A protein has these predicted regions:
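Amphipathic alpha-helical dimerization/coiled-coil segments
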Residues: 89-115
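Beta-hairpin "wing" of winged helix-turn-helix
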Residues: 63-79, 85
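N-terminal helix-turn-helix DNA-binding core of bacterial DNA-binding proteins
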Residues: 11-54
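Intrinsically disordered, low-complexity serine/threonine- and proline-rich regulatory segments
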Residues: 1-16, 97
């Protein structure tokens, strides 16, 4: 059954969450999880919404892979939060993710535009 809220929600395309997180962190020195999700949503004009249930497990996997580091800090609102920062390995992975994404988008475009 399709719920009414499903009609207004755009999901992150499969295989792009790492790319979106890495690119968001590449633009900033460090961000906490809420800032990452908020930045993606803001830059996409509200089209892309990263759910907490997807974001934090992805960040944990990225920590394990060595793509990001994390440290505890205090937000502007005086809340305790974990701040994430891109590593050298993360910058390299961002290049890999971008190349794969561009290859897939190019292939999709060719199929759509084929006569």
């Amino acid at each position: 059954m399709l719920r009414s809220y499903d009609l207004h929600r755009d999901e992150i395309p499969p295989g792009t969450l790492y790319l979106l997180i890495l690119k968001t962190l590449a633009r900033s020195r460090e961000l906490h999880g809420y800032e990452i999700a908020n930045s993606i949503q803001r830059i996409s004009d509200g089209v892309l919404e990263v759910e907490e249930g997807s974001l934090y497990p992805a960040l944990q996997r990225m920590l394990i892979k060595g793509w990001v580091t994390a440290k505890w800090g205090t937000t502007a609102g005086n809340r305790h939060a974990r701040y994430y920062q891109l590593t050298t390995a993360g910058r390299k992975q961002l290049g890999v993710e971008m190349s794969q994404f561009e290859r897939v988008i190019g292939a999709i475009t060719r199929v759509i535009e084929a006569v």
